[in-house]
Amino acid sequence: STPLSGPARAAMFTGYTSHEVGLARNGTPIPDSLRTRTLGTLMQDAGYDCIYAGKWHVHTASMPDKEFGFTTIHPHSDNGLAEACVGFLEQKHTKPFFLVAGFDNPHNICEYARSQNLPWGNIEDLPQSEWPGLPLNFAKNPYDADVISYEQSLNYSAYPTRNYTPDDWRRYRSLYYRLVEKVDAEIGKILNAIDKQDLWKNT
């Protein structure tokens, strides 16, 4: 529905696309009329224990357990998130459950682009010889819309990538892939726990 985190997550949990309810940017509150019928409250009403771990970013002024039907078992942090979910899966359950694991990564590529510290720990950079190549559509064409350069100039302070060299972009792509690998390994811990607890038939 949108590439922005807050509006995209709000769409998932309310069932409404961002343009339907005016959620055009991060930090925009969900309308009051939508807060009482969300994915969490619907599952809760159906008899499920609703558990949330990790990044929320749906409604800035609230956490998932205050209005949206969830019990929170881990804060907004990728560190320890998988372990918290595994710990929950290893418990005895008398009711069906709905567990959401809200990983932040590979979002940390945004912090890298802004020359900020990565919030959930640094990742090892690969040698330049192992950086991926650039896509065929990387080169700027003379017929590209002027609005692309204009948009880049507006966002330069937040994402100072306008002056990136081809090698800078190759390193960026390499680090993005490493972040994907990192979160993939964390999700693997949760999937392994589902295997170990033989939960697939009831999950």
Where are these regions (language model features)?
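Low-complexity, flexible helical/coil segments
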Residues: 4, 31-37, 48, 133-142
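Short, surface-exposed acidic-centric catalytic microdomains
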Residues: 3-10
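Active-site-proximal cap/lid insertion segments
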Residues: 91-95, 103-203
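Short alpha-helical segments used as structural interaction elements across diverse proteins
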Residues: 6, 52, 170-173
